[in-house]
Amino acid sequence: MKIIVAEKISASAVAQLQEPGWTVLTADQVHGKLEEHLETADALIVRSAVQADAKLLEHAKKLRVIGRAGVGVDNIDLEAATHKGIAVMNTPGANAVAVAEQTLGMMLAMARHLCRADALMHAGKWEKKSLQGTELRAKTLGIIGLGRIGMEVARRARAFGMELVAHDPFVSVSVAKEQGIGLAGLDELYAAADYITLHVGLTPQTTGMINQASIAKMKKGVRLVNCARGELVNEADLAQALQQGKVAAAALDVFAVEPPKNSPLLALENVVLTPHVGGSTFEAQEAVGVQIARQVKEYLKHGVIQNAVNVPSVSAEEYATMQPYIVLAERMGAFLAQVSEGSIEEISIRYSGHIAEWKTELIRNGAIKGILNQALEEKANLVNAAAIADARGLRVLESHKAKASTGGAGSVLSIFLKSSSEEHMVKGAVLHGDAPRLLHVDGIDVEAPLERNLIYLRNRDVPGVIGKVGTILGEESINIADFSLGRRAAEKDSEQPREAIAVVHVDGRVPEEVLTKLRTIPAVQKAKAVRLF
């Protein structure tokens, strides 16, 4: 075996790879010759600097695995790696303790004015009165996102005697309760929390979630921490709230643009700023190196796949057949998650027709992935989706009915989603070649494309709704690519308007203010923007 460690990891991590007959080349040994050495390599280990793109992977004639010492895989071309049969693994959670400790450290820095106290002392000033702080004890900490890092923060905050409330639609009440955490909606959390810390991934729904509107719902004097993703915070809105006193202090380790040369936060005294060092501890860097070395070794020796981000457990032929249905399942799941409210408790998937006779694990995982990735900090994929759902206490049920009626579609996929407040069901199929299509939503038949940007409307079936929707979208310069309609069957002898739905495929993102206008149409009961990929 030949293993290339293309970037610096610890000596103990490299030692994990030593086996009789194995050749391990370090970064110094392959410097300037990576492409040449890659021709005969079985494994490649990288951090974030080496770009394992399609061009580099052209040299990988026998490469079996790429190990990323860290979480992000933006520097690895997953499509090219998958096409060449190369497994890609990362090390999620290895730096969770480091980021959690950074979060608590920033909370203490805000509570006790530690940064300003240090600066005053270095300036030769002894100003005790202006530095009186507050305790963390008995304060309420609002945690947005209860993944690995969020849970580590919760454990440490509990030791400080803090009250814990969290928002995470993908964690069950029972799992949260075991950790002494109360679950709440975002608005409820905003209203209750003295401190708020962010630990969610960056999605269309979470981008800019801390903004003027959300800050207005928070307590006066709230303190904010962001050690997750810079783009979660609208920095201009936060700066204004800090200047006005609505937000007492903020602590940020991440920024929308790094380094943040023009951020309005740089000039404010009540802000603690660090240069994206949340995961930068000796222990965390040691942990990611040792963990990826062990994973690569296990894969090369025994074929054991851990923390893979791209590997299906089926043959290439089987994967080619089911791939359109994996896409269908993922988009149906994403659609459901974005039209639903409340904390998700149960996902039920039914396979009807030919699809019921297949190995359906990847299709199931596609559906779970589509649902979970609307809010998760740690991204689910076709390998780990079911495990993440299980760890978060979500029930996942499946049923197979090969002889069920499919209305001529050959195979139909049905997904039921139950949350703490409502239930939804959608059906879909692959039609017109490999096109994923929506066939049914909550008792109403409709055929609609599952494309990138959609608007989902539920309304009373009365004249004028379609025209008003079209007018509003036209006024907002939003182009309609497809307008699919469906309505519930009329009840006998009833004069009440039927319920109808519309799935509108548009050419770009739909701003919240457009949805607000759509909701002003008297007959419209629900208007949601859905972004599928």
Each PLM stretch: what is its role?
Residues M1-M89, N211, E491:
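An N-terminal-biased, well-structured beta-alpha scaffold segment characteristic
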Residues A27-D28, R47, A69-G70, G85-V97, ...:
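Short beta->alpha connector loops at strand-helix junctions that form conserved
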Residues V50-L57, P169-P264:
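Rossmann-like adenosine-cofactor binding region
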Residues K84, P92-T140, R148, E152-A159, ...:
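Phosphate-binding beta-alpha-beta segment of Rossmann-like dinucleotide-binding domains, i.e.
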Residues K84, V88-M89, P169, G221-V339, ...:
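Rossmann-like dinucleotide-binding domain for NAD(H)/NADP(H)
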Residues A100-A119, K139, R158-M162, V290-V304, ...:
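Oxidoreductase and adenylate-handling cofactor-binding alpha/beta cores
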Residues S313-A356, T360-F533:
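A conserved regulatory-domain signal marking ACT and ACT-like small-molecule sensing domains
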